[in-house]
Amino acid sequence: MNSKKIITDTNNEKGVITYPAHGNLYLNITNRCTAECTFCIRDLSNGVYGYNLNLSEEPSVDEIVNELEKHNLSAYREIVFTGFGEPTTRLDDLLHLISWLKKKGLYVRLDTNGHAELLYPHRDVVSELKDSGLDEVSVSMNAESEDLYNRLCRPYHKNAYSAMLEFVKKAIAADIKTRVTVVGMPEVNVEKCQQIAEQMGADFYVR
């Protein structure tokens, strides 16, 4: 998670599962991740926008649904899986929740680092996301080369950069609306990152 453009003062309450921002409702379902990014907000704060995202334990699917039902979900532009961790570390729960939200006619986005097929090498993760009804995926690229990516994002798996790019290509091929993002840092050649994204057919956004 990007440490820039974020309010870092948070309360000390138990970590929240949902939080509203920018007209969207964001879902924080895990603190587990597959990388240790040098720019991660977790190194500076326990949350964003005044919300504590440091979960004391992972909520069950039922707990997440119960929390969602407290909201007028149709009032939000998007329901976004994001949070302090990588949502695809809970792939089966993620798929179930996307399907539940889509049955209510809601627009669902996944913010991800694109490492899912390294976590589940015997599954076609993108196809499963498509089948669940996912509308949009936002993939953190954060670097124009594998070497820089490894230095900035410090992924746990080998070949994470190429796997992330392949995830983007598969999402586009599956007709999932796909956006590639980078954190604007001096080390990153944003223009080159944009070229890579556009060559693949993805939208591009600087966080």
What are these regions (language model features)?
Residues 18, 70-73, 99-104, 128-131:
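Short, charge-rich binding segments
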